[in-house]
Every structure is written in C-alpha cells, then in structure tokens.
Amino acid sequence: SQITGLEPGITYEYQAMAGTVAAKETKQFTTEAPAQLPNAGFEDWHGSSPLYIYKSGGEMFWDSGNTGSDTMNKNVTTYDATIKHSGNYSAKLQSQYVALFGIGAFAAGNVFVGKFLKIDGTDGILRFGRPFTSRPSKLVLYYRYVAGTVDYSTLSELPKNSKDMGSIYIALGDWPHQTFEGETDIPVLVKTKPADRQLFDSNSSNVIGYGECILKESTEGEGLIKLEIPINYRSNRKPTDIILVGSASRYGDYFTGSTGSTLWLDDLELIYE
C-alpha cells in the first residue's frame, strides 16, 4: 500500500494495527527531503563556443552536445529569450547536421544531467548522471516540441520521410561508478561510436525509478505547455544518482532524426507525494 499527502523532510511515528488493536511498539520514519535540480529553469549560461549550461565560475550539473557540435562551429543547444515559461530563458534543443570541410554528422539537440567528456571523431563519450539520493514521485516541466520530417536515418524503425520523435526521460539508480580518463564516479558511461556503442539501458537492474515521455507530435501554438512524467519505482532501494535527458530527436544516438526538430524546455520541478 502507499501513503500520500505526507510532508517532505518530516519524521512521522506509526503503530501497526491488528484489527482495532494497536501494537505497543511505536516506530518512526522520515520522508524524503525535497531535493530539486540545479538551474532547472535554464537561466544560467556562459561561453559561446561551446555554450555551457551553467554560470561562469559555477558548478556544472547540466551539459549538452555542444562540445561535440562546436568542432563543426555550431551549438545544438542554446537559450531562447522569446519562447519560455518564466524567467529570462528556456533551453532550445535544435537538431542539426553539423559539418566542416565536408565531414559531418546529424546531431540531436539535447540536454542531459552529466558531462560531455570527449570527442571521438564525429562521436562522443559522455558521463550520464549526478549524485542524488531522494525519490521524487514525478517530474513536472514545460515544453514545446516541433517534430520535423526525418532527413537523416540509419534505422529502419525511423526511416527517411517519416515523422521525427523527441524524448524526455528521468532515471534514479544505484549504478556502480566508473572512471574515464581522470573523470571519476561516473554512474553511466555513454559512447555513441557505432563500433564501440554503449548507451543508457532503462532496463538495467541498477535503475530504481524511471519515467519517460516520447514526443510523437508537435505541440499546438507557440507557447510552452505543462507536462507531468510519473516516476515508477521498481525497488525500495535508495538511489545514489539521477539521470535526466531531453532530446529533440529520440534516436540521435544513432544519427537519426530531422534537422527540422526543435524542443524547448523550461522550469523542471521534482514533485514529492
């Protein structure tokens, strides 16, 4: 059974009941502290080539594919001062074909909790995840999505001339930490190079809670709309890390999607019930 309506960060006492008779022993439990995501309104940015999603001198929590696309003189993820929910900016994730001197690849507009670690040719090696120990019940955010027509494809599941799809997913887990070239405590190491591909697995036994929304249609109008993504828990274990990814092209890791796809995100909030 599940109890709702409890206040976060509060210690409660309870007694077991046998019919109408209460047990003599009283026990306690403490509800989760309502931890939130840093820079969840995407107000803080710095740099230009590449553009980073945190203020100068601050601590990185979010990153994007800009480190990779910058080698081709483009940022796939930028801020937008015109299409937003509140504050000064939203994050604008715009899928593009990035090329320089005839060499290039399709790159999905994306944002993720973690860090872009290394460029490997036209591919990337990424850290997914940051420390996080709470158990939110859902993710609430505001978004706008424009789904373009697929013009780059390596997958039969999403061929050229079909409609692109975006995605937003969140995972809480207790992944064994890895190390890569000086970067320590990596929850999930992602490699997009086809010969060495290593992607996030939502079915991993280390995933404690997971929620996802696949964006199959463009949203109506030019404003952002509210979206709630429930987080389904598979275990009562306490997580050690959080992963959150938004992408204008769901299959961008396979260099598949549309250069006409754009996803705006703003005001992400974790809800505790």
Predicted regions and their residues:
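Extracellular carbohydrate recognition
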Residues: 250-272
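Short carbohydrate-recognition loop motifs
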Residues: 81-101
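Surface-exposed, short loops/turns at beta-strand junctions within beta-sandwich domains
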Residues: 3-10
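Extracellular-facing segments of soluble proteins and assemblies that are Gly/Ser/Thr-biased and enriched
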Residues: 102-181
